[in-house]
Amino acid sequence: MATYCDEPVDSYFYSSYNPYMGRYPRHRDAGWKYKSYLSHYGDTSEAFSNQQRAQLKSILSQINPKLTPRLRKANTKDVAVQVNPKRDASVQCSIGPRTLLVVKRELRRRRKLNPGPPGTPQKTEGEVRYPRTLAVYSPIAFRSVTSFLVETGKDRPAAEAQAEELPGEQPEQKGGENQAGEETNANLPEQRKPQSEDAQTAADAEGSKGKARVRFQFLEQKYGYYHCRECNLRWESAYVWCVQGTNKVYFKQFCRKCQKDFNPYRVEDITCHVCNKARCACAETQRHVDPKRPHRQDLCGRCKGKRLSCDSTFSFKYIV
């Protein structure tokens, strides 16, 4: 081999053919490990596939908004929390349109296989409304309480009431039509009016008795007096939760010694005894009940760690 300045020239020349060029990776040893910052974040191919999918979706949406890439099976790594689409459709997480579309397809297929009786209205998924949670002390709550009423007996239309109340009169009327002719047909609407009005008023009276009941009840804060006979201990508390408009106590309180639960033997509104106001407006301030500062601070330690503790102030509370 020729030499240049007494040095071999082999080290300066390389073969024009590299067997490891192209897409085939070079052979590595068994103990070799590629170190990269992307190794801590899962498979890089998955990340690139998601990026390519997003780019493809944006390109297709620019061409035609109806064109979207084929939906693949949802991956739990990308999705995080999944809920049951059949039961919890109202609280669907942002997992894409696949689950809801599948539910709609199943509903359409079931409706086609099992059509209802003729004349029944078909409900759509878009008509379902889920009311928001409202606070007790919010002014919106008292205005929209009627929206949570469940109607047990809905008002029936006059046509249905006539059909139910007058089933036996139809053959008699038919016989009268055959006998009397057109004159009786002209007088029939006048005879039906008072009967239909009586039937409608009777149905309204029955429906008004058990018309509706509230789905959940609001709670209000009151003042209560407690007495434990075993420990011979009395205490007062301004954290007595009662059903709104009544003295029905919903949560019991515990004695600080024996830890037994008790209902108050007396409950009163959190107001001044003289002016009957929540904020006392008397010239000489008498005993006033403040919800945030009960009278006996030494007795409030009995409720620590309980569900309703005096340490925390609740802005609202309701029973579902």
From Swiss-Prot:
Residues 106-130, 155-208 are annotated as: Disordered. mRNA-binding protein required for maternal mRNA storage, translation and degradation during oocyte maturation. Probably promotes formation of some phase-separated membraneless compartment that stores maternal mRNAs in oocytes: acts by undergoing liquid-liquid phase separation upon binding to maternal mRNAs. Binds to the 3'-UTR of maternal mRNAs, inhibiting their translation. A zinc finger (3CxxC-type) spans 222-305. The keyword Phosphoprotein does not apply. It comes from the Eukaryota. SMART domains: zf-3CxxC. GO terms for cellular component: cytoplasmic ribonucleoprotein granule. The gene is zar1. It comes from Takifugu rubripes (Japanese pufferfish). One of its GO terms (molecular function) is mRNA binding. Belongs to the ZAR1 family. Keywords: Cytoplasm, Developmental protein, Differentiation, Metal-binding, Oogenesis, RNA-binding, Zinc, Zinc-finger. This is Zygote arrest protein 1. Disordered regions undergo liquid-liquid phase separation (LLPS) for the formation of membraneless compartments that store maternal mRNAs in oocytes. The 3CxxC-type mediates binding to the 3'-UTR of mRNAs. GO terms for biological process: negative regulation of translation; oogenesis; translation.
